[in-house]
Amino acid sequence: MHEASLAGGILKLVEDAARREAFQRVTVLRLEVGQLAGVELRALKFALEAIAPGTALDGARLEFEEPAGQAWCMACSQTVPLAARGMACTGCGSYQLQPTGGTELRVMDMLVADE
């Protein structure tokens, strides 16, 4: 479950920001996790909630945005939806696809408190 290590990295980003910006805790953390990022959202949420106690994330509401997968087909030169890696182009059936969207994994923003 690599989501646990991803959660650790996210916590490190938050803790570093808390030290740098002098805030005590995060009340809302918004993450963008694309459909093609290879991340199981439920597992990531579980991992973040498991490591949050005693940190700046303790009690934070976690919000996720999940951008749809999208790819450029090199065979038919079209942008097509892509539900999962390894799928064929919905236009021509080719497998020569270059993902162009839905691969994101990033902290979008956070609402913080100084208390």
UniProtKB/Swiss-Prot annotation:
Residues that hold Zn(2+) according to the record: C73, C76, C89, C92
Chain residues that bind Ni(2+): H2
Keyword Metal-binding: yes
Signal peptide (from-to): none
Keywords: Metal-binding, Nickel, Zinc
Gene Ontology molecular function: any one: nickel cation binding
PROSITE patterns given in the database record: HYPA
GO biological process, one term: protein maturation
Function: Involved in the maturation of [NiFe] hydrogenases. Required for nickel insertion into the metal center of the hydrogenase.
Family: Belongs to the HypA/HybF family.
Name of the protein: Hydrogenase maturation factor HypA
Record lineage: Bacteria, Pseudomonadati, Pseudomonadota, Betaproteobacteria, Burkholderiales
